[in-house]
Structure formats: structure tokens, C-alpha cells
């Protein structure tokens, strides 16, 4: 199984399947690259499909710090650098779409050829001005979403 290590020494899982122009598939919160298991065989006939497990998800390690969308975008940049991918198309589902937009905010659009956004909520967490976010989340700083928060969300779905 392929892993790469980020600059803060967290091992992140990724899979590369097929050949052709790079297509990156970014999963949503509490999911993994396995979310795309039915799409990967189809896409891999025309693309080199890169399907990472985001930090704290799937087969990737967590870190001591809380998850932030900014950190996930940095992890994506580091993975693209590691794989020597200069230009790619990207699909972001749910939180994965937020990661893409953060990537663009931080690094621009120069490396991105095409974008597909699937089922993205405008905001993940509840706040005073957004009542449609996830309930009962114990985030300590804006933009944080730690392991404890993940467990709270999952337990609220039972």
C-alpha cells in the first residue's frame, strides 16, 4: 500500500490507478478513498486516478493537531509535489470540495485543469449565524475538526 509522509511526519495513504492525465478524487468527512470504489475503474480507463485518504480518515494517520481544511489543502499540495503532478483535474465530494477551494485560495488555480464539485454544504459546523451545520460539535478553534468531533458526529447519526 502506498503512503507518503508529510512535512509534519504524518503518513498518508494514497492509491494511483490507470494511466492518462491525473484525476484526483477527494472524499468527504468520515469517509475515505473507498467512497469512490465504483468510479475508479471507469475513470482509470482514461485517467491516472489518484485517490488519497485524507489525514485522520481511512488508512491515513491522524496527527496530534486538530484537523483543519487548511491542513488538508496543504497535504494535497504535498501529495501532488511528491507524485510530481504539475497539472490535474480534481473531484471533491462534500468536505473534499472545501479542501479544493482552500487549495485554490492558498495556491491559486495554476495547477488545476478542471474541477467537479459534488454535494458541498456551504458550511460544515453550526454557528450563531448558520443553524444548518453539524450539531454537538466540540471544536475548540474556528476551522478545527478533531477526532473527538468526528466521533460526536458519527454517534449522532445512530
Residue ranges and their predicted role:
Residues 6-65:
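Conserved HGGG/HGGXW glycine-rich cap/lid loop of the alpha/beta-hydrolase fold
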Residues 70-88:
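Conserved acidic catalytic loop of the alpha/beta-hydrolase fold
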Residues 31, 56, 97, 122-123:
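Active-site micro-motifs of SAM-dependent methyltransferase domains
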Residues 53, 89, 113-116:
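Residue in the alpha/beta-hydrolase core beta-strand immediately N-terminal to the catalytic nucleophile
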Residues 98-154:
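Flexible "cap/lid" loop of the alpha/beta hydrolase fold
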Residues 18, 82-86, 109:
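Glycine-rich phosphate-binding loop signature in dinucleotide/nucleotide-binding domains
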Residues 37, 77, 101-102:
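Short, hydrophobic alpha-helix immediately C-terminal to the catalytic nucleophile
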Residues 27-29, 88, 92-97:
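Conserved alpha/beta-hydrolase "nucleophile elbow" surrounding the catalytic nucleophile
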Amino acid at each position: 500500500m502506498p503512503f507518503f509522509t508529510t512535512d509534519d511526519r504524518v503518513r498518508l495513504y494514497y492509491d494511483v490507478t490507470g494511466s492518462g492525465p491525473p484525476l484526483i478524487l477527494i472524499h468527504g468527512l468520515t469517509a475515505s478513498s473507498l467512497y469512490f470504489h465504483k468510479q475508479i475503474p471507469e475513470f482509470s480507463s482514461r485517467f491516472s486516478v489518484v485517490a488519497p485518504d485524507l489525514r485522520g480518515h481511512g488508512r491515513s494517520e491522524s496527527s496530534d493537531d486538530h484537523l483543519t481544511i487548511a491542513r488538508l489543502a496543504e497535504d494535497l499540495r504535498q501529495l501532488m509535489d511528491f507524485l510530481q503532478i504539475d497539472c490535474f483535474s480534481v473531484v471533491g465530494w462534500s468536505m473534499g470540495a472545501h479542501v479544493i477551494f482552500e487549495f485554490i485560495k492558498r495556491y491559486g488555480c495554476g495547477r488545476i485543469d478542471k474541477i467537479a464539485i459534488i454535494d458541498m454544504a456551504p458550511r460544515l459546523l453550526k454557528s450563531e449565524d448558520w443553524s444548518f451545520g453539524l450539531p454537538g460539535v466540540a471544536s475548540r478553534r474556528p476551522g478545527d475538526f478533531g477526532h473527538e468531533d468526528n466521533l460526536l458526529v458519527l454517534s449522532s447519526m445512530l
